[in-house]
C-alpha cells in the first residue's frame, strides 16, 4: 500500500453562475510514500484559473505564485487532475492532506468543473492533521494546529519561506506523518470515499 499526501493552493474567486464565493485551485502538489514510508515520487502542477483570472493579493503574498508563472506553466483543471489520478495509481493508495479543508475544496472544484462532487480516483482518505494531533500531549483541547507548528513540536526543521507552496508543504506533512506512523493506530483514520461521501461533504440544507 502506498500513501499519497497532497496539498492544494487556492485563490478566492467569485462564482457568478452560483452567485457565491469559491476557492479555485491554482496549484496541486503531492508526494508518494511506499509501505516503508520512503518518498518514491512527487507531483506538482499549476492550474489555469477559469472562475477568476485575477489572483488575489493575499494569494500572491502567501504563495509567491505570480500570474505570469501560472500563465506559462498552468494547464486546465480537468487535465491536471487526470494527470494526478494517473500518477497516483489510485487503486492501492491512501490519500492524505493536512486537514480535510483540502478535501472540501477539491470536491467543490470537481462539482464546478464536472457537475458532480465525487472525486472518482480517491477511494480512501485520511486526515493527516487529525492523526498527528493525537500524539501532541500539550494540546488537551485538541485544537487544530498548523503544519509548521506540528513540525516544530515534532522537532522537524522547516524553512518558513518554503511553506505555502503545494509540494513543499507535502514534504513537511510527510515528515510529520513518518514521525508518528503506527499501522494499527492509523487504520481507524482511513475513510472509505467510494460512496457519496463527497456529496455529503458539500451538502448545505
Q: Can you describe what each PLM-predicted range is?
A:
Residues 1-4:
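Extreme N-terminal starter segment of soluble prokaryotic enzymes
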Residues 19, 70-73, 140, 163:
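Alpha-helix initiation/capping motif
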Residues 8-18:
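Short acidic, Gly/Ser-rich segments with clustered Asp/Glu that frequently serve as metal-coordination loops
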Residues 61-84:
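Metal-dependent phosphoesterase signature
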Amino acid at each position: 500500500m502506498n500513501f499519497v499526501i497532497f496539498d492544494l493552493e487556492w485563490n478566492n474567486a467569485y462564482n457568478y453562475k452560483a452567485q457565491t464565493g469559491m476557492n479555485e485551485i491554482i496549484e496541486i502538489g503531492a508526494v508518494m510514500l511506499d509501505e516503508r514510508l520512503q518518498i518514491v515520487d512527487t507531483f506538482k502542477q499549476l492550474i489555469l484559473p477559469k472562475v477568476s483570472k485575477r489572483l488575489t493579493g493575499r494569494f500572491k503574498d502567501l504563495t509567491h505564485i505570480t500570474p505570469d508563472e501560472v500563465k506559462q506553466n498552468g494547464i486546465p483543471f480537468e487535465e491536471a487532475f487526470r494527470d494526478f489520478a494517473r500518477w497516483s495509481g489510485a487503486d492501492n493508495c491512501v490519500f492524505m492532506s493536512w486537514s480535510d479543508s483540502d478535501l472540501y475544496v477539491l470536491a467543490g472544484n470537481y462539482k464546478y468543473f464536472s457537475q458532480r462532487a465525487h472525486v472518482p480516483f480517491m477511494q480512501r482518505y485520511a486526515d493527516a492533521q487529525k492523526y498527528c494531533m493525537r500524539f501532541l500531549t500539550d494540546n488537551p483541547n485538541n485544537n487544530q494546529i498548523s503544519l509548521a507548528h506540528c513540525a516544530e513540536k515534532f522537532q522537524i526543521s522547516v524553512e518558513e519561506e518554503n511553506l505555502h507552496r503545494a509540494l513543499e508543504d507535502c514534504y513537511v506533512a510527510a515528515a510529520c506523518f513518518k514521525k508518528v506512523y503506527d499501522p494499527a493506530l492509523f487504520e481507524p483514520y482511513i475513510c472509505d470515499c467510494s460512496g457519496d461521501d463527497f456529496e455529503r461533504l458539500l451538502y448545505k440544507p
